[in-house]
């Protein structure tokens, strides 16, 4: 981060490898759900941050982790810094996980999967079975399987969230020009 700015991260020690076969893709679903209603941001985090002039937020899910971040937050605005910490708090265990919002993300993720399954991706998927010796690294695609993505329930996502989004699986990182007091 540059002078007068800080970046805020929640690193969640859960990714595709923690999923059972019938859950493949739920870590990625949760990543998407973090941008919808939370306990303190019922209109969603992006809407709140946009009103405050912050546009640089994102997340990604990997095999071993899910990382959420807000970048370029002006540290001269202590109220905004506090709000960003509250966002990390909500992401860590207070997503609302509304069924109607999950249906929106189901469609988005299925489209992401469809667009990502070009010839090179299909070839890479077959090669991964050999590269990773048929381990979970080869069989658990971060984006998820069509079977799981088409049929997961809101209760399954909520159970996965409560099983894995715990303090012993999380780290908060704040980098930049910030006074820790």
Describe the function of each predicted region.
Residues 4-73, 119, 139-143:
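M16/MPP (pitrilysin/insulinase) zinc-metallopeptidase core fold and M16-derived inactive scaffolds
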Residues 37-39, 71-105:
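M16/insulysin-pitrilysin zinc metalloprotease superfamily fold
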Residues 33, 37-38, 83-87, 91, ...:
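Scaffold signal of the M16-like zinc-metallopeptidase fold and its non-catalytic homologs
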Residues 69-74, 106-112, 144-146, 171-179:
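Conserved short loop/turn motifs at secondary-structure junctions
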Residues 46-50, 95-114, 179:
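Acidic/histidine-enriched alpha-helical segments
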Residues 15-20, 75-78, 98, 180:
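Short beta-strands and strand-coil junctions in structured, solvent-facing domains, enriched
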Residues 1, 179-181:
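Proteolytic maturation boundary segments
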């Amino acid at each position: 981060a540059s002078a007068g700015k800080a970046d805020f991260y929640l690193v969640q020690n859960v990714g595709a490898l923690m999923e059972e076969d019938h859950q493949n893709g739920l870590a990625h679903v949760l990543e998407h759900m973090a941008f919808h209603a939370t306990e303190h941001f019922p209109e969603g985090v992006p809407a709140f941050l946009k009103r405050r002039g912050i546009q640089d937020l994102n997340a990604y899910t990997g095999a071993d982790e899910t990382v959420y971040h807000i970048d370029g937050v002006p540290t001269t605005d202590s109220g905004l810094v506090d709000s960003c910490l509250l966002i990390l708090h909500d992401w860590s265990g207070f997503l609302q996980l509304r069924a109607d919002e999950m249906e929106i993300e189901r469609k988005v993720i299925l489209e992401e999967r469809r667009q990502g399954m070009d010839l090179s991706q299909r070839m890479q998927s077959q090669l991964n079975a050999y590269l990773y010796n048929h381990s979970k690294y080869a069989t658990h695609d971060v984006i998820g399987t069509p079977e799981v993505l088409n049929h997961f329930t809101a209760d399954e996502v909520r159970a996965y969230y409560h099983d894995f989004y715990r303090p012993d699986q999380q780290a908060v990182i704040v980098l930049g020009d910030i006074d820790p007091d």
